[in-house]
Each structure stands twice: as C-alpha cells, then as structure tokens.
C-alpha cells in the first residue's frame, strides 16, 4: 500500500495529464496549514504559467477530478490556485492498519535500488579513535542501515589507514625498545610468531613516543620514512609486524565502534591493495594519462570549465612512494574486481575538508574507466565543536579520544537515570543496559539530527536529556508506547482494528503516513536528519494524542481497541525508525 501522499500525487498527476499538462505538477504534500487541509497541491500556478492559463481555473478543474478519488473527503481551491485536500477517516484508518502490520512500517523499497559500497569510519591503525571519528562512523552506519532497508545491496568498508608514516614510526620505536625481535633480522624471512609482540596499550604508547621524537629530530623522522618504504617494498619482517599491528588495532576498534552500534562488512585497509598498485600505474601509463613531472608520476585532472585550481593526482612521488590518491584508486579497482556483485556506486562518508582529494580521485577513476565518475560520491560533513565554536577538545586543549567521549556519555546517562523514576525492581545489569542505550542514543541522534554538512556544538548535558529534540526523548517516547500496550495487555485489553474518528487520531495517522517519504528523502539526499525530523514529529504527535484521548482507560471497547492498535502502529514505526538511526529501545525505563 502506497502512502496517502504518494497516492494523491499520482491521482493529481493523472488529472493534470488529462488536461494536457505534465504529471509533475500534481505533487501533493502535507499541508502547511493543517487547520485548513491535510494535504495541498501547488502545481496549478506553475502549470498555468506553462500553459498560459488562469491558475484558479486549472486548480478548479483538478479539484473537481480529485473529489472523485476514493480517499478524498474534500478538495477546495484557495488563494491564487492552491488545492487543499482533506482525506476521509476511512482512508486514514486503512493507512494506519497497513503501517501497523507492514514489515517496513509503511515505507516502500526504492525504485532505483543499487549495488552500493559505503566507505566510512577511516580509523588509523595504532592510533586511538578521537571525537573526529564520531561523525563518519555514525553518519556512515546510518546511511548503510537506511540504504539496506530501502532495498540497496550494501557493502560497508572501514578503509583503515594502515599504510602511512605511522607504520614506520611503530617499527622503529619497537626496534629501539626490543631490537632482538626476529622481525628485525633482515636475513630472516619467516615463519613469524602467530602471537603479536605488542598489545593495544603498547601501540598507544609507541606511536606518540615515536611521533614526538620525529617532530623534534629530522634524522629520527628519516628512519621512520625508510622503515615504511621498506615495509611497502615487501620486507618480510616488517610486513609481519604490519599484520600484527592491524590485528591488534582491529580488536580495539571493534570495541569503540561496537559501543556506538556501528558495524562493517569489510575491515580492509590501504595495505590490502598494495599489490594492485603496479598494475594500476601501468594502466594509467598505457592509457596515456600519466606523465612525469619533477621525478614524480602524475595525472592531470583539471578541466577548462573548472572555476578553481585543480591540482594533478600524484600516482607516484619523486621518492618512488605512493600516497592516498593511489591507494584510493587501487581500492576502487579492488572493489570493482573482487566484490561478489559489481558496485554501481560508491559513497565516501568523510570530512568535507577532503572534498578536493575526492574530486581528484573520482576524476582520475572516471578517466581510466574504473567506474563512471558520477557513480562516486563524497558525502562530506562538518565538525563537532565545543562551546567556543571550535573543534571539540579536552580541557587541556588536546584531541578528545572517542573512548573518553563514550565514558562521559555513560556517566551523564547514569546521572540522568538516577534522577528519573526507574522501576524499583530494575537490577544493576538492566540499569547498565538502559544507561548504555541512553548514551548511544544521545551520541548518535545529536549528530544525526543536524544537517550533515553543518558544524554543531557538542553539549552532552542537553543531548542526554529526556526532553526536547534528543535521542533519549525519542527512546522514552517509544518506551512509553510500549508501556501503554503492556499495561493494557495485563488488564486483558487487546488491540483491534483502527477506526479513526478524532482529530488527534487523524493528525497522528497523517504523521505516520510520512515515514516512507522521510526514509527515501534521507537516502536520496544522503541526509539522515530528514528521518530524525520525521521521528521527532511522530513522537510529538503521539504525545498530543496521548494527552487528548484516553487509550487503555477508554470505556468504549471498540474505541479502546482502535486506539491500542494505533498506538501499536506508532510503536512499530518508532522502533523501526530508531533502529535505522542505530538506536535500540529498552523494554522499560
């Protein structure tokens, strides 16, 4: 069953076509003035301009045709040519029934579902994740959930940073501490121990030590450069260490990502495509796209139509090494060649400050024919800022670790729950579980509710509140609906068939009707805040419904059964939508 808005749009489009006008003028949406109408169609004004006719005349004829539609209670012309529509109680009742029993809670699969790779996360091996990783993780994971739900075949890839200078820092610092390790014997080629010689704590100590030394000593930095060059060239001991570093890091990363309910299909890194680079470079040469410049190999990607400077892609630098341009291109090649189903598009959820890099890479990929340039999308986002409007930092001015941010969220969630009226029989384990869900809801929703491309100010006290536009508020709204249904069941009352008769019921069903449009809008525009807005509106509509009408306490049995069924539909859509945002709802709180 399609949404009422979509159904009415199709009917209005057909009415415009019957008048010899384009169907696109028939778009119907929720009314800006709910006191006057449920839906509105504004297409008559644009159609009149195109046809050279009076807009009210066109609107009048369209309204007359729409009055014949089974769902329409009234169709009236207002102002210069607006068409105001009221739908029948029967149509709303049928729609609510469908939402309640539908696996997609009233949404529909996308007509343009595609095989999609979503590249997000981008954590670095041996480096702790920081607050800057929050947005990529949360936005990327939400997009993969939304896209899968809408019918896309999605493969998500964390795309680890495991091939840069930090690897050289680790190797050399480990050598300084334990020079006798077999990995440093250049004459030895294996086999190497299965157990890593380092822990995640070791990596967290070794890297900053080496990095600080390298910043103060050019010779020390040169040692790291030499070590990473030897690693990239295939030195067995260093490659074995790399595998250990990656293995240890992934275990730790899975904990950080897991806390946020973030998952990946692939845990690949830059090093996984190293073997493809020589062949890739040769392809660029054979295609006549690569040329030498000051000892480096570059690809010009600038176009005459460019209105900004577009530097060339650096395939191979003057020292013979490769960088992010090359590994990103090799990763595209790897995905196109090795994934079970060939990708039709790739989305890169990365800080918008990397826009130039991705534009260069996408152009080069298109020029070589790896994939059409317009099938590659950079999903950029703004920064997480402190109260001063600058990127969020610790009190000491350092970068805040993601694990510390999560601990802060847990502490604030516990504080909020301590002030709440929790069930007396709630044990420590359940309380901890609820606190974690509140913390995750706060972190994820506070990020997702903002337009992706904007910066936002991080305010943990506000984000963990059970009031206002927050994740915990939406979670509590869903729990409250579940509580109403549970208590009704305990008193022997069950849901029946939805029969809409009251204004508060109508408003609630009209909000339920918009879920599919919000879902597909969030998917199409890569903007999760669209779904957040819908769910917040639904929670508010239920709150108004709950305040206006008795539900389980309704004396009339049929009305009670109807309202319980409507509440169950709200529960279903709220939980479904929150799951798409990566927010789990507890049974009680």
Swiss-Prot record:
Keywords: Aminoacyl-tRNA synthetase, ATP-binding, Cytoplasm, Ligase, Nucleotide-binding, Protein biosynthesis
EC identifiers of the protein: 6.1.1.19
Reactions it catalyzes: tRNA(Arg) + L-arginine + ATP = L-arginyl-tRNA(Arg) + AMP + diphosphate
A GO term from the CC aspect: cytoplasm
SMART domains cross-referenced by the UniProt entry: Arg_tRNA_synt_N, DALR_1
Main enzyme class: ligase
Paired cysteines (S-S): none
InterPro entries, alphabetized: Arg-tRNA-ligase, Arg-tRNA-synth_N, Arg-tRNA-synth_N_sf, ArgRS_core, DALR_anticod-bd, Rossmann-like_a/b/a_fold, tRNAsynth_Ia_anticodon-bd
GO MF assignments: arginine-tRNA ligase activity; ATP binding
Primary residence: cytoplasm
Subcellular location: Cytoplasm
Biological process terms in GO annotation: arginyl-tRNA aminoacylation
Span(s) of short sequence motif 'HIGH' region: 123-133
Stated family: Belongs to the class-I aminoacyl-tRNA synthetase family.
Quaternary structure (record): Monomer.
Protein name, as recorded: Arginine--tRNA ligase
């Amino acid at each position: 069953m399609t949404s009422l808005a979509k159904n009415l749009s199709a009917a209005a489009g057909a009415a415009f076509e019957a008048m010899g006008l384009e169907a696109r003028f028939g778009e119907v949406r929720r009314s800006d003035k709910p006191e006057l109408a449920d839906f509105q169609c504004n297409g008559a004004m644009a159609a009149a301009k195109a046809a050279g006719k009076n807009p009210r005349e066109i609107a009048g004829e369209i309204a007359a045709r729409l009055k014949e539609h089974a769902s329409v209670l009234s169709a009236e012309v207002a102002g210069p040519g607006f068409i105001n529509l009221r739908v029948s109680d029967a149509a709303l009742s049928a729609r609510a029934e469908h939402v309640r029993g539908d696996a997609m809670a009233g949404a529909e699969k996308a007509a343009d579902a595609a095989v999609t790779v979503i590249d997000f996360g981008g954590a670095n091996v041996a480096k702790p994740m920081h607050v800057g990783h929050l947005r990529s993780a949360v936005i990327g994971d939400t997009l993969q959930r939304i896209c899968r739900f809408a019918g896309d075949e999605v493969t998500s890839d964390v795309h680890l940073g495991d091939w840069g200078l930090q690897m050289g820092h680790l190797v050399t610092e480990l050598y300084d501490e334990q020079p006798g390790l077999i990995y440093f014997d250049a004459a030895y080629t294996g086999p190497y121990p299965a157990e890593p010689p380092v822990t995640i704590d070791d990596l967290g100590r070794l890297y900053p030590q080496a990095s600080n030394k390298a910043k103060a000593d050019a010779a020390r930095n040169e040692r790291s450069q030499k070590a990473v060059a030897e690693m990239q060239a295939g030195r067995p001991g260093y490659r074995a260490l790399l595998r250990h570093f990656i293995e240890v890091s992934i275990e730790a990363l899975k904990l950080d990502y897991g806390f946020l309910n973030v998952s990946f299909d692939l845990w690949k890194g830059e090093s996984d495509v190293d073997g493809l680079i020589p062949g890739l470079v040769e392809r660029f040469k054979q295609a006549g796209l690569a040329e030498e410049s000051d000892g480096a190999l570059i690809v010009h990607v600038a176009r005459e139509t460019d209105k900004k400077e577009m530097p060339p892609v650096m395939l191979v630098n003057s020292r013979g090494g490769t960088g992010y341009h090359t590994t990103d291109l090799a990763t595209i090649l790897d995905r196109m060649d090795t994934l079970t189903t060939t990708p039709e598009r790739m989305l890169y959820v990365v800080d918008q400050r990397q826009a130039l890099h991705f534009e260069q890479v996408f152009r080069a990929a298109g020029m070589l024919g790896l994939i059409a340039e317009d099938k590659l999308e950079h999903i950029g986002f703004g920064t997480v800022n402190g109260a001063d409007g600058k990127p969020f930092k610790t009190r000491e001015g350092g970068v805040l670790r993601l694990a510390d941010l999560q601990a802060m969220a847990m502490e604030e969630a516990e504080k909020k729950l301590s002030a709440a009226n929790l069930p007396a029989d709630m044990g420590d384990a359940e309380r901890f579980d609820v606190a974690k869900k509140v913390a995750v809801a706060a972190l994820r929703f506070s990020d997702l509710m903002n337009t992706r491309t904007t910066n936002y100010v991080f305010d943990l006290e506000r984000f963990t509140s059970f009031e206002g536009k927050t994740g915990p508020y939406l979670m509590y709204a869903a729990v409250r609906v579940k509580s109403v249904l549970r208590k009704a069941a305990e008193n022997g009352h069950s849901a029946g068939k939805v029969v809409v008769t009251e204004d508060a019921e109508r408003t609630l069903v009209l909000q339920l009707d918009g879920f599919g449009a919000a879902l597909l809008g969030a998917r199409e525009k890569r903007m999760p805040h669209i779904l957040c807005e819908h769910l917040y509106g639904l929670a508010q509509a239920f709150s108004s419904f709950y305040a206006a009408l008795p539900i389980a306490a309704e004396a009339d049995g049929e009305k009670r059964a109807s309202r319980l069924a409507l509440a169950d539909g709200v529960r279903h859509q709220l939980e479904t939508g929150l799951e798409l945002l990566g927010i789990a709802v507890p049974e009680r709180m």
